Amino acid sequence: PGCSPLQGKGNEQRLVLQLDTFQMPYTGNFHPEFPPGAGRRILYQDPLTQDTSWLLGTLPMRWAERAEVHPVVEEMYLLAGEVHGDRGVMRPGAYFWRPEFVPHGPYGTQTGNLYFFRTQGGSLSTTYQDARRPFRWWPDDDVVLPSQYESARGAVPGTRRW
């Protein structure tokens, strides 16, 4: 038989609707200090916790000069493109989970990219600060890994450029 929602369970306010992201407009200028060249599509914002999920797309040859800090947990899955950041280069399939108040960036992309982001712990806000090191293309790998994955550390074999 087909699936149906449980009757009388849950909170209708928190219902997640099916969205056609191809029909959704990108929003820009979502922070006055955010570098130009990116757009966001909000997929869901929990009305009770303000936890948010969204897509972020950026143009090719875009980079930032400052680091960011958020008061909430931030989670990301890279859907397409590549990202050069303060801890190395991420490619499609890259994932991170970052605790609140951890400075990160600056970031850049040669190809442009599409991310899926999610926050936990309330409403997202961003504070910009000077980066601990300046942005550069092809930074050294400096990934933070849980101890059980340390043996996997090292360069990914294959081509450096797309």
Labelled PLM ranges:
Residues M24-P25, P35-H70, H84-P92, P99-P103, ...:
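Conserved short histidine dyad/triad with adjacent acidic residue
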